[in-house]
């Protein structure tokens, strides 16, 4: 049986009680919002801790009863059955508390920059990129999030060669961060007359939306160019230089934005994307340096890693990182069953974190 850090739990309960006391006092509107939000985050853990301690005390009483030689056989049998049930409940509570105490990703509550790019497979890859975007769009709607397209380059027969969107909602990065990587589709294209299955792919990048304080970008490190926006055939589509291209010289990261007629809006959007990409590149560098450690985690987050296959003829979706197959492809593509994959990935990630803590102990 795993043990819990009782001293840490005492501090947690004391902090929770102090927050409740603050809430009863006269506090300003800003403090009220902050305190109620923190309490809502702590409440499930606090309830689990209280339940765990109650179960622990009840088990202690049962053990005393069982150790008493005067306890009658019928009472002893009832006590042993109750102890077995309480043992199982205690183990569940311990696991729940240990998971809740895991270090939180500082970016988990952030909005997301979602980038989807068609890969190998030509037109079919563009169509698949469109399918993936709609899947995330529908999933976001089910979570109560909003999705705003920042930039889109449409495919010749539909879908997207590339699409960048901002997903706004509490916990968006926590839910979507394991979606980064290569998604592969196997299906018969509408244009295929022989019924042959084609394989194509699209790359998904999920980046947390970062702020100026998260990434230090010096103005001297930027090369900013303005130009006239161009259409699909290369022709200029307006007479003003509203398009923006920003190059971050130290990393070589380039962001081009021309979707708005406003140069100011294009520049703001480009800077938002640039900040997210620079932050992500630094995280990728740090992760590579800890590659041995990350072998125990859910995938590497490597953009070139094939993470999932969508097989339309068989109606299945397979996530290769956790060897999970769901025969619910229509529901996954509709965003309805995507949560099952995300929850399984999160559980696996938490299990790996717990194992690492155990090894470090």
UniProtKB/Swiss-Prot annotation:
It is found in: Cytoplasm. Keywords: Cytoplasm, Methylation, Protein biosynthesis. The keyword Lipid metabolism does not apply. The modification N5-methylglutamine is found at residue 235. GO terms for cellular component: cytoplasm. Pfam families: PCRF, RF-1. Methylated by PrmC. Methylation increases the termination efficiency of RF1. Its main location: cytoplasm. One of its GO terms (molecular function) is translation release factor activity, codon specific. The keyword Protein biosynthesis applies. SMART domains: PCRF. Belongs to the prokaryotic/mitochondrial release factor family. Peptide chain release factor 1 directs the termination of translation in response to the peptide chain termination codons UAG and UAA. NCBIfam families: prfA, PRK00591.1. This is Peptide chain release factor 1. It comes from Rhodopseudomonas palustris (strain TIE-1). The lineage of its organism: Bacteria, Pseudomonadati, Pseudomonadota, Alphaproteobacteria, Hyphomicrobiales.
